[in-house]
Swiss-Prot record:
The keyword Membrane applies. Its cofactor is heme. Belongs to the cytochrome P450 family. Heme binds at C440. A cytochrome P450 monooxygenase involved in the metabolism of retinoates (RAs), the active metabolites of vitamin A, and critical signaling molecules in animals. RAs exist as at least four different isomers: all-trans-RA (atRA), 9-cis-RA, 13-cis-RA, and 9,13-dicis-RA, where atRA is considered to be the biologically active isomer, although 9-cis-RA and 13-cis-RA also have activity. GO terms for cellular component: endoplasmic reticulum membrane. It catalyses: all-trans-retinoate + reduced [NADPH--hemoprotein reductase] + O2 = all-trans-4-hydroxyretinoate + oxidized [NADPH--hemoprotein reductase] + H2O + H(+); all-trans-retinoate + reduced [NADPH--hemoprotein reductase] + O2 = all-trans-18-hydroxyretinoate + oxidized [NADPH--hemoprotein reductase] + H2O + H(+). PROSITE patterns: CYTOCHROME_P450. This is Cytochrome P450 26B1. Keywords: Endoplasmic reticulum, Heme, Iron, Lipid metabolism, Membrane, Metal-binding, Microsome, Monooxygenase, Oxidoreductase. GO terms for molecular function: all-trans retinoic acid 18-hydroxylase activity; heme binding; iron ion binding; retinoic acid 4-hydroxylase activity. PANTHER family: CYTOCHROME P450 26, CYTOCHROME P450 26B1. The keyword Plastid does not apply. The lineage of its organism: Eukaryota, Metazoa, Chordata, Craniata, Vertebrata.
Length: 511
């Protein structure tokens, strides 16, 4: 009995010693990790490196960032200020908030900083993508891609975008059950990208299969760049390979079959624009270009669409004010959008609708910020930003802390109205699409899509929350509901009366 007690005490002592050793090892390794990055400061600059934590060896604070969401940024900003250091996705990083700080970074492209996304993002988007190009190559690619988003191009996409949205809302309204808005918004924006932007003629089954692969790709675009079995990065690479194979097949079929087309889609324009600028695009460039177009049109637009629906649910007075504007501009008549009423210029003239979309993008900016690599050491907010480090300028936090916006946490479209124009008080206080020479090329298409969605929601649907409370919002990798946003949609006829489903009609007939 005594020996058994001794064995138990010995085992507990050994376990305690092991735990203490592990804790000491972690503490020492973490301290060495901090010193390793402190040693990278530019010795020729007297300013200190920004305050902050580099987390644990190799992984840094990546898991804190993923698990804490918006609290990660806000807690560190409160502790360290608008400029602080961290270590995310395998790279030392300085996060930057505030209009003046962001302005210096965006205006310093090519001489202070250069675009460089995390390694996983660079590898998965591909070497030929616009996002990964720099210097003269970037300028050339931007000219080629810019025609995709010209006024003429948007006008040609508009009827197709409207049709895709109308068909989707009819499906939502015909479903007697509630729908998961974020999931369905992802399917909607993916369908828009594939069928409208790229003009691919895929069956519903092929579209569904491609969507599943694409989701796996998107989920791992921002992952630790560790290429080992079962890692997110490896899953992303596998999804990219499958996508490129499917895209090559779709592109070849499209190039061979040009019959029955009534408009030039983005892929047509991209091919012709490449020829006009003296360089016919290779198949690899076309595949990378189409993948990037889908990626750009998908996640951020689905995020903003979900935020739009949620805010219209929360603020029915905003929805009614939208309807009044549509009626006043002869777009909405007897509860329906007048045929042929939607033109790009007409939509652009709807001032209140524009305010609503601007406020959605201010309060729920889908993208947290943009990545840059430091080309030469410079000063920011009293700190040195060392050469070779990465910088992430924060869009969302700059919006949240901008002094020009009153009641910053309140959804208030009127702040962008002609009487207030809060966004006019500072160029870099409001930047949902970035800024400088690398501002988002597709911003006008994204806003057009959101406006058409708002118009169609106002005209053909009544919708209500199917749960007792609204879900919490998560900001990583894009703004989205942490739990499902469940909503029931009801179709409306020309008199704004609900259209009953077949089952409801039968039940009504038996009463």
């Amino acid at each position: 009995m005594i020996f058994q007690s001794f064995d138990l005490v010995s085992a507990l002592a050994t376990l305690a010693a092991c735990l203490v050793s592990v804790a000491l090892l972690l503490a020492v390794s973490q301290q060495l990790w901090q010193l390793r990055w402190a040693a990278t400061r530019d010795k020729s600059c007297k300013l200190p490196i920004p305050k902050g934590s580099m987390g644990f060896p190799l992984v840094g604070e990546t898991f804190h960032w993923i698990l804490q969401g918006s609290d990660f940024q806000s807690s560190r900003r409160e502790k360290y200020g608008n400029v602080f250091k961290t270590h995310l996705l395998g790279r030392p990083l300085i996060r930057v908030t505030g209009a003046e700080n962001v302005r210096k970074i965006l205006m310093g492209e090519h001489h202070l900083v250069s675009t460089e996304w995390p390694r996983s993002t660079r590898m998965l988007l591909g070497p030929n993508s616009l996002a990964n190009s720099i210097g003269d190559i970037h300028r050339h690619k931007r000219k080629v891609f810019s025609k995709i988003f010209s006024h003429e191009a948007l006008e040609s996409y508009l009827p197709k975008i409207q049709l895709v949205i109308q068909d989707t809302l009819r499906v939502w309204s015909s479903n007697p059950e509630s729908i998961n808005v974020y999931c369905e918004a992802q399917k909607l924006t993916f369908r828009m990208a594939i069928r409208v932007l790229l003009g691919f003629r895929l069956s519903d089954e092929e579209l569904s299969q491609l969507f599943q692969v694409f989701q796996q790709f998107v989920e791992n675009v921002f992952s630790l760049p560790v290429d080992v079995p079962f890692s997110g990065y490896r899953r992303g690479i596998r999804a990219r390979e499958m996508l490129l194979k499917s895209l090559e097949k779709a592109i070849q079929e499209k190039l061979q079959n040009t019959q029955g087309k009534d408009y030039a889609d983005a892929l047509d324009i991209l091919i012709e624009s490449g020829k006009e600028h003296g360089k016919e695009l290779t198949m690899q460039e076309l595949k990378d270009g189409t993948l990037e177009l889908i990626f750009a049109a998908y996640a951020t637009t689905a995020s903003a669409s979900t935020s739009l629906i949620m805010q219209l649910l929360k603020h029915p007075s905003v929805l009614e004010k939208l309807r009044e504007e549509l009626r006043g501009n002869s777009i909405l008549h007897n509860g329906c959008v007048c045929e042929g009423a939607l033109r790009v210029e007409t939509i652009s003239s709807l001032h209140y609708l524009d305010c609503v979309i601007k406020e959605i993008l201010r309060l729920f900016s889908p993208v947290s910020g943009g990545y840059r690599t430091v080309l030469q050491t410079f000063e920011l907010d009293g700190f040195q930003i060392p050469k070779g480090w990465s910088v992430l300028y924060s869009i969302r936090d700059t919006h949240d802390t901008a002094p020009v916006f009153k009641d910053v946490d309140v959804f208030d479209p009127d702040r962008f109205g002609q009487d207030r124009t809060e966004d006019k008080d500072g160029r870099f206080h409001y930047l949902p699409f970035g800024g400088g020479v690398r501002n988002c090329l597709g911003k006008h298409l994204a806003k057009l899509f959101l406006k058409v969605l708002a118009i169609e929601l106002a005209s053909m649907s009544r919708f209500e929350l199917a749960t007792r409370t609204f879900p919490k919002i998560m900001p990583v990798p894009v703004v989205h509901p942490a739990d499902e946003l469940k909503v029931r949609f009801f179709g409306l006829d020309s008199n704004q009366n609900e259209i009953m489903t077949e089952t409801e009609a039968m039940l009504g007939a038996t009463v």
